[in-house]
Amino acid sequence: MQTKCFQDLVAWQKAHAFVLAVYQLSSHFPAHELFGLCSQFQRAAVSIPANIAEGYRKLGTADKLLFLNIAQGSLEECRYYVILSRDLGYMDINAYEALAIQLEEVSKVLNGYCRGILNNSHGMNCKSLI
C-alpha cells in the first residue's frame, strides 16, 4: 500500500492511539507523580509515533531504521512503565491488560514495518540497526 504521509502508516496510527490511552490513564495518577512517572511515561509514549513520523521522510534505509529503532526502544520503556504503574496500584488489572495488549499490537506492527523496510532495501546490510 502506497502512503502519502506518516499518518497513513498503521504503525503510526496504533502508536498514536497508545499515546492517547497513556494520557487518559496517567491523568488519574497521584498528583505527586505529575513530574515523575506520569511525565516519563507520557514522554516515552509520545516518542514512539514521533520517531515513526520522523523516520518516514528519511531517504536512506539506515536513517529510517535508526528512527524506528529509537521508537522500539521507547516502546520497551513504556512496557516497563505499564508494569510499574500496575505494581504501584495506579491502574487496575483490566486497564493493565488493555494497555499491555495495545502495546503488543504496536510492537508487532512496528517490527513488521522495520522488516518491510529491510526487505525493500535490496540487500543492504542494516540488520544491526533493528
What are these model-predicted stretches?
Residues 1-54, 58-130:
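Short, C-terminally biased terminal segments at protein or domain edges
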